[in-house]
Amino acid sequence: MPFRSNNPITRDELLSRFFPQFHPVTTFNSGLSGGSFLIEHQGQRFVVRQPHDPDAPQSAFLRQYRALSQLPACIAPKPHLYLRDWMVVDYLPGAVKTYLPDTNELAGLLYYLHQQPRFGWRITLLPLLELYWQQSDPARRTVGWLRMLKRLRKAREPRPLRLSPLHMDVHAGNLVHSASGLKLIDWEYAGDGDIALELAAVWVENTEQHLQLVNDYATRAKIYPAQLWRQVRRWFPWLLMLKAGWFEYRWRQTGDQQFIRLADDTWRQLLIKQ
């Protein structure tokens, strides 16, 4: 149920107008993108979300609602309400673990997602890389950062191996181990892109786990594993630059020291992989 309004409303107004019988249960602060909170009434639970980035255009939040509206409920929460600065979606019962599931199980989830109809908007990384450079702390901008940005701009993004709907933020904290199988939450970066970009972006523990995930996916997708791994590797510098830039951007927004530590660690990874 989308609801358009140019006037933002408070949490209490949202609940009294649309969910008068529900009451807040708990607040979630997991992840790097910010929190959300849970509401409940007679055993029925919804998650109330807000945009993680206060400076992002409202269209980005609306796209998340549209993505959830077209995804099957077996892999994503069903949305119930959208309006300016608020979205209400199903609560997914299950365990959120601190480590990734078996690579074959995760490959199955991603392959199923990639078989769904496309969302209708492309993920393009270069505009984001440039935005993060422009919006970062000037004291943190280095010659090396600018050099890598120019190098990627000249090289252009890898040509997609297969174009599919992507989640683009797959890590242990965004995976719900439910009774009916794995499901994904936090779809704010979803869009259409290369399947290899999705695989490159998964927050794996080590290269061995990454290779196994790619091999398991390649088996399902009937792609030569070596071919898929080469394409995944082509995306590595783009993904590392994206992560480093996002951490720098969030550092300037929030002043949270964790983002500086994560940015520094990602810059070191970039130097190693060059």
UniProtKB/Swiss-Prot annotation:
Pathway(s) this gene product operates in, as recorded in its UniProt entry: Cofactor biosynthesis; thiamine diphosphate biosynthesis; thiamine phosphate from thiamine: step 1/1
Domain of life: Bacteria
Keyword check for ATP-binding: yes
Nucleus as UniProt keyword: no
InterPro entries xref list: Aminoglycoside_PTrfase, Kinase-like_dom_sf, Thiamine_kinase
Pfam families assigned to the protein according to its UniProt record, in alphabetical order: APH
Gene Ontology MF term list: ATP binding; thiamine kinase activity
Enzyme type, top EC level: transferase
Keywords attached to this entry: ATP-binding, Kinase, Nucleotide-binding, Transferase
Enzyme Commission designation: 2.7.1.89
GO biological process entries: thiamine diphosphate biosynthetic process; thiamine metabolic process
Segments forming a coiled coil: none
Catalysed reactions, as listed in the record: thiamine + ATP = thiamine phosphate + ADP + H(+)
Functional description taken from the UniProt entry: Catalyzes the ATP-dependent phosphorylation of thiamine to thiamine phosphate. Is involved in thiamine salvage.
Similarity field: Belongs to the thiamine kinase family.
HAMAP family assigned to the protein according to its UniProt record, in alphabetical order: Thiamine_kinase (MF_01604)
Protein name (record): Thiamine kinase
Organism: Escherichia coli O9:H4 (strain HS)
